Each structure stands twice: as structure tokens, then as C-alpha cells.
Amino acid sequence: MRRLPTREVVDMKMVVAVIRPEKLECVKKALEERGFVGMTVTEVKGRGEQKGIRLQFRGREVEVDLLQKTKVEVVVSDDAVDEVVEAIVSSARTGKFGDGRIFVIPVEKSVKIRTGDEEV
């Protein structure tokens, strides 16, 4: 692997947002409008404080304890974290239980698979 020459070490963070699936397009648009186009999107299941929901299915009540969610991951420089978080919150919030959660995680390095270039 070759390490790219850097003028300065840039602290990077991964912003991980677990959101309602129907809010994905709004979140993508909000991020793109602010210049953040790279992201990884995964369909996931989970639960938080709401602990699932009860639904009617073929006349019977069914408890669903893991709900469909969408996970959006964006890696940005440390100084862009607040802008990314604000974009996600403002575009994904409904004000109801189940809106999701955002996590900010340190990233130690990034390696481009095609070239082997490493950023620290």
C-alpha cells in the first residue's frame, strides 16, 4: 500500500444514521445539496425505545419487535460532522417515536481498494 502525501493529518469521522426507510430520499437530497454525495446505504432491522409495534394481519394482532430501518453511513472530515448531522436530523425528523438515531465514530484510516492509496 502506498500512503498518499498529506499536507496535514485530517481527523475523519463516520456518521451513521439509522432512519425511517421512507425518509431516505429526503436525507440523500439534503446531504447532496450540502455537497456530501458519497454514502453507503443498508436496509436493516432494529428497535429502540418503542420496542416494536402491534399490527393487524389477516384479522389477528401481530407483534413486530424488529422494525425496518435504513442505515446511512457517511465518512467526512471532523469539521463537517455537525453539518452532516444537521442535514440528517432536519430531513429525517417527524417528531414521532422511531425517527432513528445518529452515531459519530472515529475513522483511523481509509484505503482505496482500486489503488491501495491510504489516507490517515
Swiss-Prot record:
Gene Ontology terms for molecular function: ATP binding; enzyme regulator activity
UniProt entry tagged with the keyword 4Fe-4S: no
Binding sites annotated in the UniProt record for 2-oxoglutarate: G48, E49, Q50, K51, G52, K69, G98
Activity control mechanisms: Activity is influenced by intracellular pools of the effector molecules ATP, ADP and 2-oxoglutarate. It senses the cellular nitrogen status through 2-oxoglutarate, and the energy level of the cell by binding both ATP and ADP with different affinities. ATP and 2-oxoglutarate prohibit binding to Amt3. ADP promotes the complex formation.
Keyword Cytoplasm: yes
Coiled-coil residues: none
SUPFAM superfamilies linked to this entry: GlnB-like
Domain of life where this protein originates: Archaea
Keyword line: ATP-binding, Cytoplasm, Nucleotide-binding
Cysteines engaged in disulfide bonds, as pairs: none
Pfam families the record matches: P-II (PF00543)
GO biological process entries: regulation of nitrogen utilization
Binding site for ADP: T40, G48, E49, Q50, V75, G98, D99, G100, R101
Role description: Involved in the regulation of nitrogen metabolism. Regulates the activity of its targets by protein-protein interaction in response to the nitrogen status of the cell. Regulates the activity of the ammonia channel Amt3 via direct interaction.
Subunit-structure text: Homotrimer. Interacts and forms a complex with Amt3.
Entry's free-text remark on domains: Undergoes conformational changes upon binding of effector molecules.
PANTHER family listed in its UniProt record: NITROGEN REGULATORY PROTEIN P-II (PTHR30115), NITROGEN REGULATORY PROTEIN P-II HOMOLOG (PTHR30115:SF11)
Family label: Belongs to the P(II) protein family.
The name this protein goes by in its record: Nitrogen regulatory protein GlnK3
Source lineage: Archaea, Methanobacteriati, Methanobacteriota, Archaeoglobi, Archaeoglobales
